[in-house]
């Protein structure tokens, strides 16, 4: 996909770098697969902020994505590729032979007119979904289930992919982009190929307002606050915070381990690489 740098006709355009995909559908999305998406502004049912830096942004509809890919043995034709404001990857509208339409995460290289299918007997082809026990070792995959039938949870964002490196007994071993090696049941499903829109990481929004259009509010540094608001706040003049970095609630940050799901530790063969 071509990457466009804008002519600096204004300060807000000077640093804009956008990724343009001419193959994306330019009309409205498929209405029966849309859902209302209301904004919370980061507040809970008491009106209190539970997630900071959320608010405003353009109105959006949620696109119902088929993460389970459980319509087995029925081929589907890709009608078009679409932009989805709810995720970094592009999505594809597919029409099954029985007339049903669904949205799926579009893999890299998929285009309008292609055919895909799901199930044990599916061909080894980009866009097809099948259990890990039927995927050749060494294959690049995405949209992987962690529990059979639950729906895809791993490798769903733009450019994401995982490599199947081994299969032994009832478990398959996956190598994630982070360097982590993880075991997953062989009955879990995965889609062949990598996720589309891999150039997403090259874009630059160019100005603060573009972030506000996406519903992201400013992040204020702790050292710029008062002591009542943050452990790094206060002091005469500019300070460095005076202690190791912590969150507003005093939890160490910048590298502090917070993973507490011991139940699934046994599935991790090797921890991810340190950055």
UniProtKB/Swiss-Prot annotation:
Listed under subunit, the entry gives: Part of the 50S ribosomal subunit. Forms a bridge to the 30S subunit in the 70S ribosome.
What NCBIfam families does the record point to?
Answer: rplB_bact
Q: Which UniProt keywords apply?
A: Ribonucleoprotein, Ribosomal protein, RNA-binding, rRNA-binding
Origin: domain of life? Bacteria
HAMAP family in alphabetical order: Ribosomal_uL2_B (MF_01320_B)
Which SUPFAM superfamilies would you find in this protein's record? Nucleic acid-binding proteins, Translation proteins SH3-like domain
TM spans, by residue?
Answer: none
Region feature (Disordered): 34-59, 223-275
List the protein's name.
Large ribosomal subunit protein uL2
Q: Which family does it belong to?
A: Belongs to the universal ribosomal protein uL2 family.
GO MF terms on file?
rRNA binding; structural constituent of ribosome; transferase activity
UniProt KW Protein biosynthesis keyword: no
Q: Name one GO biological process term.
A: cytoplasmic translation
One Pfam family in the UniProt entry: Ribosomal_L2
């Amino acid at each position: 996909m071509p990457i466009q740098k804008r002519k600096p006709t204004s300060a807000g355009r000077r640093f804009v770098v956008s990724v343009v995909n001419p193959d994306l559908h330019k009309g409205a999305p498929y209405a029966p697969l849309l859902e209302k998406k209301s904004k919370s502004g980061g507040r809970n049912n008491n009106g209190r902020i539970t997630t900071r830096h959320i608010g405003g942004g353009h109105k959006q509809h949620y696109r119902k994505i088929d993460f389970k890919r459980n319509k087995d043995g029925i081929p589907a034709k890709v009608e078009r590729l679409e932009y989805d404001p709810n995720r970094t990857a592009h999505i594809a509208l597919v029409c099954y032979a029985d007339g049903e339409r669904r949205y799926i995460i579009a893999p890299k290289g998929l285009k309008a007119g292609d055919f895909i299918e799901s199930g044990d007997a599916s061909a080894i082809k980009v866009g097809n979904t099948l259990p890990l026990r039927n995927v050749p070792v060494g294959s690049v995959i995405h949209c992987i289930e962690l529990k059979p039938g639950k729906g895809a949870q791993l490798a769903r964002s733009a450019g994401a992919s995982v490599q199947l490196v081994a299969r032994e007994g009832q478990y398959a071993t996956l190598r994630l982009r982070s360097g982590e090696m993880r075991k997953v049941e062989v009955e879990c499903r995965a889609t062949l190929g990598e996720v589309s829109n891999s150039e997403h990481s090259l874009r630059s929004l160019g100005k603060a307002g573009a972030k506000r259009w996406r519903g992201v509010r400013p992040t204020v540094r702790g050292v710029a606050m008062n002591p009542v608001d943050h452990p790094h706040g206060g002091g005469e003049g500019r300070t460095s915070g005076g202690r190791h970095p912590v969150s507003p609630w005093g939890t160490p940050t910048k590298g502090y381990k917070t993973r507490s799901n011991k139940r699934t530790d046994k599935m991790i063969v090797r921890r991810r690489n340190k950055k």
